[in-house]
Amino acid sequence: MSSSRVLTVPNLLSLSRLPLAAAFLFVEGRSARVVLVGLASLTDFFDGWLARRGQTSQLGALLDPIADKTFVLVAILAFLIEGAVTASEFFIVISRDLATAIGFIVAYLLPGLDPRAFKARWPGKVVTVLQLAALFALLLRPAVFPALVPLIALASAWAIADYTLMLHRQRVRS
């Protein structure tokens, strides 16, 4: 049951990822960053878990993916600035998020498409899990990170294709 309520537990969990993202830029030390990635991962899991049990809201449907993408973007950007990842690795890690943002804008501008159709789908969830795994790898086992980048690229291509097909079907139906 979707509601227009703003202060739901899932929304608060999603919102909590925004200050976690900001903190990622300022905390020093690997341990503190591991805690931040862990908290972001847990809040993402639990807000989704609660939403699947009926605690959904219109705001949450928008807020959750924005919070996810913001946390990953800020964290991987911090690693880029610090020289821990290359520019190409950075863009591969955020490629699905860039494509989703562009798709959202296109869906908003074109008749027959509804940007609210951008709901969480399995391919996108796989990308998010791999992105969070990549952040953990950069902090705990940096040598593993390069092996995750091609997996993120493949999963991102899958997610982008899935969203593109979904939008195409939506446009054909309208």
Where are the model-predicted features located?
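N-terminal membrane topogenic signal
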Residues: 2-15
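A feature for the membrane-embedded catalytic helix bundles of lipid/isoprenoid biosynthetic enzymes
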Residues: 2-5, 35, 66-174
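Proline-centered helix-kink/hinge sites
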Residues: 10, 19-22, 65
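Membrane-embedded alpha-helical segments that form the functional core of polytopic membrane enzymes
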Residues: 19-59, 75-80, 89-91, 147-157
